[in-house]
Amino acid sequence: AEKKTVTVKQTGSPIXXXK
């Protein structure tokens, strides 16, 4: 789960969509 968070940050947190 922690590794997934790092991947999202590298792509620019597209899942969040917020940023």
UniProtKB/Swiss-Prot annotation:
Keyword Methyltransferase assigned: no
Keywords linked to the UniProt accession: Ribonucleoprotein, Ribosomal protein
Disulfide feature: none
Gene Ontology CC: ribonucleoprotein complex; ribosome
Family, per entry: Belongs to the universal ribosomal protein uL30 family.
Description of how the protein assembles with itself and partners: Part of the 50S ribosomal subunit.
Official protein name in the record: Large ribosomal subunit protein uL30
Gene: rpmD
